[in-house]
Regions:
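Right-handed beta-helix
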Residues: 17-25, 30-113
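Beta-strand/loop nucleic-acid-binding surfaces
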Residues: 2-18
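Short intrinsically disordered, low-complexity coil segments enriched in acidic
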Residues: 1-5, 71-74
Length: 113
């Protein structure tokens, strides 16, 4: 019916923030006191807005507006972190596998010789 409301608040999950793109389809929950009041619950997948991956045991979180630009993806026991650049800022970083572990400081010391 082409009706338009004033700006609506956006529901967050655990204080995360990712505003939908202008023109994106969103689910709006209208309050019982009138259709002008409501909350934007978020975007949803549909035939024109499909998820980049799907399947049993797949978890993916896109972090940028462009799908595939930056994301976390978990499937089959493997976590993929994809981004144009990644910065780890910590007092200690350890890489660990079944065969052993090494800290970032040890790697840097080895490179410096």
């Amino acid at each position: 019916d082409n009706s338009v409301t004033d700006d609506l608040p956006y529901l967050t999950f655990n204080d995360e923030y990712k505003m939908p793109k202008v023109g994106a389809s969103v689910l709006v929950v209208h309050l019982s006191n009138g259709s002008a009041m409501g909350i934007v619950a978020g975007t949803y997948w549909n035939s024109s807005h499909r998820p980049p991956v799907s399947g049993k045991g797949v978890y993916r979180k896109d972090l940028a507006q462009a799908i595939g630009e930056a994301f976390l993806q978990y499937s089959g026991g493997s976590l993929q972190i994809h981004a144009p650049a990644i910065t780890l800022d910590a007092s200690r970083i350890t890489l660990a596998t079944k065969s052993g572990s090494i800290t970032a400081a040890e790697i840097i010391n080895h490179i410096k010789g």
